[in-house]
Amino acid sequence: SLCDKPHHNCIDGQTCYHTCCQNGLKCVRYP
């Protein structure tokens, strides 16, 4: 998976610096 370490809720499809959102979870991607 491109995502790891689920965090607080977020908007699906939202992305920013080394982060992504999937299934309402904010995830941190490996740099």
Swiss-Prot record:
The modification 4-hydroxyproline is found at P6, P31. Expressed by the venom duct. One of its GO terms (cellular component) is extracellular region. Its main location: secreted. Contains 4 disulfide bonds. It is found in: Secreted. GO terms for molecular function: toxin activity. Keywords: Disulfide bond, Hydroxylation, Neurotoxin, Secreted, Toxin. It comes from the Eukaryota. The cysteine framework is C-C-C-CC-C. This is Conotoxin Cltx-2. It comes from Californiconus californicus (California cone). The lineage of its organism: Eukaryota, Metazoa, Spiralia, Lophotrochozoa, Mollusca.
